Amino acid sequence: MNILIIFVSYLLGSLPTGFLIGKYLKNIDLRNIGSGSTGATNVLRNVGKWPALIVFIIDVGKGLIAVKIAQHYTDQGLIEVIAGISAITGHIWPIWLRGKGGKAVATGLGMFLALSWKVGLASLGIFLIVLAKTKFVSLSSISAAIFLPFFMFFYLGNYMHSYFFISLIVALLVIWKHRTNITRLLKGEESKINQNQ
């Protein structure tokens, strides 16, 4: 059962939401446009606001549902975490798109909302505050990732300490996926949310 949960979580994460929205609404391949990501930000810039919101909600749902499925069928915290990581892995490296997906910010948010809604909302709060101040989605995502392990430790303390280490791994993964954005930020070449790349 545990292996099945992990496999289903990966397939769930692999659902190419942004790619399908781009193809259906504008007949475009997001992998070849803008940032090349299939996430909500690239959808926003190349398809529109409402499609981007739909993609964001579904991508959050992928991480959340994966963990909830694990919580329903097992009481093993490790399997819950692996299910969430599997959904994130599927989102970044989807089997349907030959491994070219998104950056897992929304799916990661869904995962941590399911593990601890306080941690998830606190991280979302950091994202929104930085976005409001700077208009850089990438910087907002990186900032939320940096604060994530601290929120996990603050809200959970010694309880489920393994969650802290997983949050650290996810944070590092998100930052790594934004490495080209970091380079552009340092060069002053990064696009703001209302700018096309």
Swiss-Prot record:
It comes from the Bacteria. GO terms for molecular function: acyl-phosphate glycerol-3-phosphate acyltransferase activity. Pathway: Lipid metabolism; phospholipid metabolism. The chain crosses the membrane at residues 1-21, 50-70, 77-97, 111-131, 136-156, 157-177. Keywords: Cell inner membrane, Cell membrane, Lipid biosynthesis, Lipid metabolism, Membrane, Phospholipid biosynthesis, Phospholipid metabolism, Transferase, Transmembrane, Transmembrane helix. Its main location: membrane. It is a multi-pass membrane protein. Its EC number is 2.3.1.275. It catalyses: an acyl phosphate + sn-glycerol 3-phosphate = a 1-acyl-sn-glycero-3-phosphate + phosphate. Belongs to the PlsY family. This is Glycerol-3-phosphate acyltransferase. The gene is plsY.
